[in-house]
């Protein structure tokens, strides 16, 4: 059986406001990420859906997302569908460690910026190994909103996480507070 190379995708985006007060984005993504069309909210916020085209993560996949909001910019970043994390590649009784999937998100906000990071739910399949980190750096006058929904196993199919593991690290650094 042919073994496929893991994904090493990244997305780097910068948000800034124009003279009319609307937030625009620059930057781009490398597969398996794809940006869909950004919409402007009533308040000038850039509403941007992010698509993971591979359909899910398997052991060894490495994803990184870097978001940089310049002063006065506002953005809502969401995902198009649930993030699926499948069982680890190469995991067996002989190799119980398997390979971890990883996703790191770094958000850097400048003065008076506002970021809403609201991806759809994440489903960890049986025996998935997943490590995620979310790091946010923001000044006292900026705001950040996030929520996370995680399902451990596909419970409707009576599947459990079993020997899987989910590690999540959240770091928020507030300057001037």
Model-inferred region functions:
Residues 70, 110, 137-139, 173:
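Feature marks extracellular polysaccharide-active and adherence modules
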Residues 121-124, 129-131, 144, 148-177:
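Short acidic-hydrophobic catalytic motif
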Residues 40-42, 107-110, 144-146:
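Short amphipathic alpha-helical segments, especially helix-boundary/capping motifs
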Residues 75-131:
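Intrinsically disordered, low-complexity linker/loop segments enriched in Gly/Pro
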Residues 1-100, 161-177:
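Terminal catalytic/cofactor-binding subdomain
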Residues 67, 112-113, 147-149:
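Solvent-exposed loop/turn tips at the surfaces of repeat/solenoid architectures
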Residues 114-115, 142-144:
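Repeated loop/turn-to-beta-strand initiation elements of outer-membrane beta-barrel proteins
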């Amino acid at each position: 059986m042919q073994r496929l190379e893991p994904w090493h995708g990244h997305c780097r985006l910068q948000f800034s406001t124009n003279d009319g007060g609307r937030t625009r984005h620059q930057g781009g993504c490398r597969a398996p990420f794809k940006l869909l069309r950004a919409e402007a909210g009533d308040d000038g916020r850039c509403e941007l859906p992010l698509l993971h085209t591979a359909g899910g993560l398997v052991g060894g996949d490495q994803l990184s997302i870097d978001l940089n909001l310049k002063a006065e910019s506002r953005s809502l970043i969401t995902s198009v569908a649930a993030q699926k994390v499948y069982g680890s590649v190469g995991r067996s009784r002989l190799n119980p460690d398997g390979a971890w999937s990883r996703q790191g998100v770094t958000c850097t906000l400048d003065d008076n910026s506002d970021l809403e990071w609201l991806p759809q739910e994440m489903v960890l399949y049986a025996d998935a190994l997943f490590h995620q980190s979310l790091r946010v750096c923001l000044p006292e006058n900026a705001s950040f909103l996030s929520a996370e929904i995680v399902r451990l196993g596909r419970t409707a199919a009576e599947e459990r996480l079993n020997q899987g593991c989910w590690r999540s690290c959240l770091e928020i650094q507030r300057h001037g507070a």
